[in-house]
Amino acid sequence: MTKNIHKHRILILDFGSQYTQLVARRVREIGVYCELWAWDVTEDQIREFNPSGIILSGGPESTTEHDSPRAPDYVFTAGVPVLGVCYGMQTMAMQLGGKVEGSNQREFGYAQVEIKTDSALIRDIKDAINPAGEAVLDVWMSHGDKVTAIPSDFVTVASTDTCPFAIMANEEKRFYGVQFHPEVTHTKQGQRLLERFVLDICACEALWTPATIIEDAIVRLREQIGEDHVILGLSGGVDSSVTAMLLHRAIGKRLTCVFVDNGLLRLNEADQVLEMFGDKFGLNIVHVAAEDRFLAALAGVDEPEAKRKIIGRVFVELFDEEACKQEQVKWLAQGTIYPDVIESAASATGKAHVIKSHHNVGGLPKEMKLGLVEPLKELFKDEVRKIGLELGLPYDMLYRHPFPGPGLGVRVLGEVKKEYCDLLRRADAIFIEELHKADLYNKVSQAFTVFLPVRSVGVMGDGRKYDWVVSLRAVETIDFMTAHWAHLPYDFLGRVSNRIINEVNGISRVVYDISGKPPATIEWE
């Protein structure tokens, strides 16, 4: 009998911080299940979730404003430990009788926190000892407001030169507030602090591991599906690949994978997917060669969002056609992951703006009479990759750079043509090959080539040529929300440029994109 890996769970209430998902990922890394909910959750919902502890996230609002978000009152009467982070500490302090004020001295970045009082939260956790003999923590601050008076039943645990209450605690109730961000790597002991809260103070057992997640998923899939058949759109990307492997382990040949070759994939990608999943792992795969259909639908279209929607629509049409041929199929599997669920919830409540539409989220027709199977919907991307390794998928496939759902359809600027895609595929393959050879591939977060629909004069031998331009793009980022262009060596860029121009007939010029995000996005379209 498998252990209940959801037995011990942490509830994280989201007040809008850019780091909130990182808090959840850190808790999962500790080995404990957690969920991320909006701050205005009801008492009944919290009772039903039955958390072992609650974390209040940071956020951009000011608790000094009358309409700023507040934690539900039940959070402080539920009888479980509570950790407030940054804004979470401020709202905890204010709601329990303390004071918060705006400050002329804002703290953004590195700070040293001096420990004044012993606390279960940080006992024996320190980075150094200062001349006064106090333990010191190196932390990351990001706040304007600050607590100026703590609730009467709290004590001051730590402070900085400009923040008198950097950590506060009520040990009896197991309520703690930290003005810094323990979830970011700049807070050196942040993970130890979170481990102390989750494992010791909340008394959670670390049951959330790749092996137990797989075991639990297989049991639940078999219970949900029974003896029925399942269909899955297999793209060769991380999410659909891990979904396929989980389902294959759970139900074997009752899974049918539909692989749509849209003509917008990377060089030799279709052959690689079919060889790996069909020949090596023995999955049942239906190969749909649909390059002509996609390119016909994209003819004459140059607006990026229109291209995305067309690619999504044609994929759904093809998938629907194949699903109708599979008379035994009762379930549709999707590689939805936890950030998709969070994003969809935010969109449903009007708290998010669509910057680029996702071609594979919520796109399948409502009239399809199939049940939905989403075995990854509780997992973050890093967890999906770890599970993939456990299931036997190769590291290089799981950890390769992100590739957009519409594929080369949004890396060929303007109208998409077969000629452009063929040239781009070959140029991009050279760039990626050289990154691997120079041991640079894993030192950048994402790298790819973009086809520009403009011609440029070049000289080859004694003749002139008038051919196409491509741009190389490489970025470094932690979360893909912001990114810096990668400072690749000039000799490396020169080598890539020479190879592309000499080996790809039809390209006469190679440029390098040095735009950051913001103001640019990582992808060009």
Swiss-Prot record:
Span of domain Glutamine amidotransferase type-1: 9-207
Q: What is its EC number?
A: 6.3.5.2
- List the Pfam families hit by this protein, alphabetically: GATase, GMP_synt_C, NAD_synthase
Top-level taxon in the UniProt lineage:
Bacteria
Query: In which residues is ATP bound?
Result: S235, G236, G237, V238, D239, S240, S241
Q: Which UniProt keywords apply?
A: ATP-binding, Glutamine amidotransferase, GMP biosynthesis, Ligase, Nucleotide-binding, Purine biosynthesis
- What's one GO-annotated cellular component? cytosol
Concerning PROSITE patterns, the annotation shows: GATASE_TYPE_1, GMPS_ATP_PPASE
Record has Nucleotide-binding as a keyword: yes
Q: Please give the catalytic activity noted in the UniProt record.
A: XMP + L-glutamine + ATP + H2O = GMP + L-glutamate + AMP + diphosphate + 2 H(+)
The keyword Cell wall biogenesis/degradation is annotated on this UniProt entry: no
Q: How does it assemble?
A: Homodimer.
The protein, known as: GMP synthase [glutamine-hydrolyzing]
Q: Which organism is it from?
A: Yersinia enterocolitica serotype O:8 / biotype 1B (strain NCTC 13174 / 8081)
The gene name on file is guaA
